[in-house]
Amino acid sequence: MNNNELIEKINKLRKEKNAIILAHYYQRPEIQDIADFIGDSLELSRIAQKSDADIIVFCGVRFMAETAKILNPTKKVLHPNPESGCPMADMATLEGVKKLKQEHPDAVVVSYINTNADVKTVSDVIVTSRNAVKVVKSLDAKKIIFVPDQFLGSYIARQVPEKEFILWKGFCPPHFNLSKETLLELKQRYPEAKIAVHPECNTDTVEIADFVGSTTQIIEYATTCDADTVIIGTEVGILHALKKKNPNKNYVFPQSADYCGTVHCCDMKKNTLDKVLEVLEKETNEIILPSEIIQKAVIPLERMLAVA
């Protein structure tokens, strides 16, 4: 089947089954185009919580689909490709976080939403890159265990210097591989350009940026700032949204040191139209979580949503 035929079948099935399709900005363009909602982790968490659909098809990596299930335990959440995982989320382990809690009993565990469900169960609050600083500032605790992204944690620590941070040594491989030198070379080629990066980038890269923010915040900044050219330091999938919002600007994506070339999350690209159709037809690849995990993991998620 060609894409038009796939899309026609997808649209028919989602109407028949009262299903919605959620897609992260890093998904393939054709996946973003069929989605009912496109967003970053925070936006999609809110939409998932408020949805009245019977079925949620989540086009993202696994922890995102798990989050949708945790917030909607009675709904059927389908993940088009179960091989679409997050290497950074897998870097944080349940036993490792428990050990840190024992070593620092006066600390609060703040987990990035990019964690697996079991780690969320031992977290005090969840954050996204968009609301992390606000949530951490709202906490009474003076000591923070931040899991799993050391670079986002370091960025938050610089914004909230009154708190002590214990950082898990995790990272996002595509963002980590984007070097300061690469951005500076692009700046020489485009001297009038602004640089916008994600806080998952390493500290040296973040420090030379004109703007640091979440995926949605980068899209807002890049499409509305006064520069005609913006160097984008995050996953190349957001180019689709950038062009839709403001096609008159020049968006430059740097080459990364990883094997994918640009800042490119190979896992995010594993969800395809044929896989979306397959899970809608067969209702396979359902996210199943034990009720105990859901009951524990929803607490820090709801704390986040209440604050931000």
From Swiss-Prot:
Associated pathway: Cofactor biosynthesis; NAD(+) biosynthesis; quinolinate from iminoaspartate: step 1/1
Alphabetized InterPro entries for the sequence: NadA, NadA_sf, Quinolinate_synth_type2
Keyword hit for Cell cycle: no
Protein name (record): Quinolinate synthase
Organism classification: Bacteria, Pseudomonadati, Aquificota, Aquificia, Aquificales
Cofactor: [4Fe-4S] cluster
Positions with a binding annotation for [4Fe-4S] cluster: 86, 172, 265
Alphabetized SUPFAM superfamilies for the sequence: NadA-like
Cofactor note: Binds 1 [4Fe-4S] cluster per subunit.
NCBIfam families assigned to the protein according to its UniProt record, in alphabetical order: nadA (TIGR00550), PRK09375.1-2 (NF006878)
GO cellular component entries: cytosol
Organism of provenance: Sulfurihydrogenibium sp. (strain YO3AOP1)
UniProt similarity note: Belongs to the quinolinate synthase family. Type 2 subfamily.
Keyword Zinc-finger attached: no
Gene assigned in the entry: nadA
Catalytic reaction(s) noted: iminosuccinate + dihydroxyacetone phosphate = quinolinate + phosphate + 2 H2O + H(+)
Functional summary from the UniProt entry: Catalyzes the condensation of iminoaspartate with dihydroxyacetone phosphate to form quinolinate.
Gene Ontology biological process: 'de novo' NAD biosynthetic process from L-aspartate
MF (Gene Ontology): 4 iron, 4 sulfur cluster binding; metal ion binding; quinolinate synthetase A activity
Pfam families: NadA
Subcellular locations according to the entry: Cytoplasm
Residues the record lists as binding iminosuccinate: 24, 41, 112-114, 129, 198-200, 215
EC numbers, comma separated: 2.5.1.72
Keywords from the named record: 4Fe-4S, Cytoplasm, Iron, Iron-sulfur, Metal-binding, Pyridine nucleotide biosynthesis, Transferase
